[in-house]
Structures are given as C-alpha cells and as structure tokens.
C-alpha cells in the first residue's frame, strides 16, 4: 500500500509498556507519533491547513454555566476539498493524544479515509487526559465530571459547534457536512456509544476492537489469547499458574515463601499480589502488531519451552514440556528479563533500585500507585476511575475452574474492585459509581452494550485473537453470537489479528487480510459519504473563504 511522503519521515512509536505489572492493560489503540520536526511543520501557525487548536468545552454539560476547560485538538486539512467537505474525527481515548499525531496522516486509516473522501482529519484529546483536563489534581471530587455521558456530550458539542481554523465559514460542522468517527479500542466503543446515545451526530462510524459490553468478571479477556498463542506455551503457562495458585491456596508457609523466592517476589506480602505478578507477562499479547516480529511475548514462550531465542530446530507445534521444566524455565526468564528494574521504571523515589518490588503490593494505601493524583501519573488513574465509576469494570481475572487459565484465579474481580477504594477514597459526599450501587448491567442497558444491532452506517472491525474481542460485537460470548455483517452495519473479523490491527498502514503492509480490511472500510465510508451529498443534506467542496 502506498502512502504519502509525510509517512516516510516520521517514526512510529509503538511500545505500549512491555513491563505491564501493576494494573491491567487499558483498551487503547496503538500509538503513532510524528517526529518532532514533522509535527512542528504541521503545527506551523503561519498556515491554516494543519495545526493545533483549543476548544472551550463544558465541564458539565448538564450545567453549562459551571465553566469550561480547554480541550486540545490537532487538525490536518491537506486532503480537505473546502467548506462542506467531510471531517474525520479520531480520539485515542483514555491517554494523552500527543503520542497519536500520526493519525493525522495517511499512515493510518483515518488519513486514508480523508484522502479518499476529500476530508480533514481532526485529532481530539479526551477530557481529563493530557492537557485537556479541567483540574490538575485528580481527586475523587475533581473526577466527578469524568464519565461516559459527559464524554459523549463532548464530542457531540465539538462536532456541532467547533470553529475549525481551516473552515472559515462553519460549513463543515456536523449537520452541514458528514462527520466520520474512526476509533479503536475504547474510542472504537465510544464511537458506537455516541451513535447509540446521540444518533445521527456522526454520519458514519468505523469502530475497531471496540469493547461495547461492560463486564465485571472479565475472565474472557484471556480466551482469545489462549486461542492465538502457541498451544504448547499455553498449556505450560496454564500449568505454572495452576501450580502457583495451588501453593498460595493450600501450601504451607514454607512452600509459599519458596515460590515467592523462586520468582524474586519474597518481599511481596500477599499471595494474591504475588500470583497476579507472576501472571502479568501474559498481558504483553495485547500490544503485538502484525509487524512486531520477535516480541516480548514470544521471547517468554521460547524461554518457557526451553528454546534458544529465535530457535529453528524446535517449533511451537511441538508438545508442551510439562510443569517440571516449564516452572524453572519461566522463573529464570521472569527473574532475569522481566522483573529487574520493573518498579524502578515508574520513576518514584520509593521504588528505586533494580531489585525493588514494592510496587507490587496493592494493599499499601500509601503506595505511589494510589497517592499520585497528578495527570501524569503512571497508572492510568483516570481510566481506573471510569472502570470504578461508570462502571466499565473489565476486571481481568482467572478463568472458571472448569476451564484452563493463563491468569491467577486469586486475582478475581473482588481483587481489582477492592483497589477502587484505595485509588478513590471518599471525599465528603463524593465517591465512585460502583460504590453507590452502579453495575455493569445498568451501564449496558444505558448504552445497549451487545445489543447495538440497530445502527446506521457503522462498520465493525475486530481481530480474531484480540483479547478485547470478548467484550465486542464479535464476541463468542455474546448470547446471539458474533454480529453478522449487514449493509448498514458491515462487520469484519480479521483472521489472526490482535488489537486494533486495522488502524495502521504498517500492519496492512505486513498482512493481506488487514490490507483488504482497510480497503473495505475506506471504500464503504466513501460510499456512505456520497450518500450524504446525494441526499441533499449538504454540498461538497464549497468555494473556500479567506
């Protein structure tokens, strides 16, 4: 697939923290950050086609007089054909948007759509992330205005009223021009929820890997991983986890101390914390892209099976080596390649030292994990708020007893829910939603969750082995089964793909199924865009006004 000259001069920053250990991975799309010199050229204020701008957004849409905050957005109107032409909106969701400036270009599906339909790309930062937060301190009280309904209202208000610098006469606001939502992961689900809660605001929606169903006990997160990872590695990893759980549940104090020592976790007081920490490297699966090559996940599997790195003599199809070999093999890799410097990497004074493992104690209320209330905290505090408050939950847990598990069953839903109180202690009358009795069932009834079949011009894309597939419309656990493709709601399940693999052109360059999916999405969005103009709703490419 050919891309513009702009693509060739930026670097793609893709590492989503391989050292995941303290909290479950958040549902975010893969980062794609422009090099500084390229971004500086895009943000040059002397020209109007590209740049950075700010939108005064209501803090509380139910009470506009309460005040506003500055919501940051970036724009690229290089492909825009003038007032009345389409606008493609992308938000990375629950992360600062500065790492996603590549989504302004045709190195990503947003830019491909813009090029095809003659539209502009607008990258909007989500409330409470990056520079787009109304409060510097993320206290329980300050976070009261971070919820799904306020977030949906943000994008509706922006689409309808933003004075885009490249659109001098306002002819490209929603209703006057077709706005197209393209999002991945939470932002993919958010696009579907906007269509559910504010239908018609966006003319068309592309939702990639969107977990639309809130789930309290989300053991199903690991099911696609088990289906996609090498079978021998899955069998052996599961055997290790069962063994570790058995010791912490039924073993003597000496046996529990020995297994902690084996994994370098002798200073972790609680067995469930130690078991969760031993399980944590399985999370590396989510960040794999189709061009990732020899990723951390496969290095771990090689180590468990006793393969030398990049070995060719033995294949993943060979049988499992069994617990007797897998346990010491995994412990050696864990203590050599995974654990050293893990806590230190977060940058807090209390966690300095390569062998420091204090970060793994989730019972310590004074831990920086719970006490850092700044926007720049390292623990996705604001996302943790949404999981506890809306509540999305998505607590990633061990499988039921009648199924193999690759994550400790000691880290159950209550293990994660317990941490909500440590993250967000009550301040006067202010607390989080699930403490007030809100449930996943309530949220799903509000958004329609898995029952989003009756939508217009919404394109669903999922990866076969994406762990967030289990909460998506393509879920095998959906009572009606994975959604079937229709003309109004096309659906593609990409064979062998993981999380949001259709968003970046480099994945299409590496995989024909992804390329075909990107082509299908772009073609369908273009057809829907033509329908907007043919229906008389607006005029494309009105003369530009200076």
What annotation goes with each model-predicted range?
Residues 1-13:
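Classical eukaryotic N-terminal signal peptides for Sec-dependent ER targeting/secretion
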Residues 10-120, 131, 138, 145, ...:
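Catalytic-loop region of hydrolases
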Residues 128-141, 216, 502-503:
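Glycine-rich "HGGG/HGxG" loop immediately N-terminal to the catalytic nucleophile
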Residues 142-170:
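Alpha/beta-hydrolase active-site loop
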Residues 186-200, 205, 212:
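Short glycine-enriched nucleophile-adjacent loop
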Residues 201-326:
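A catalytic-pocket lid/entrance helix-loop region that shapes and gates access to the active site
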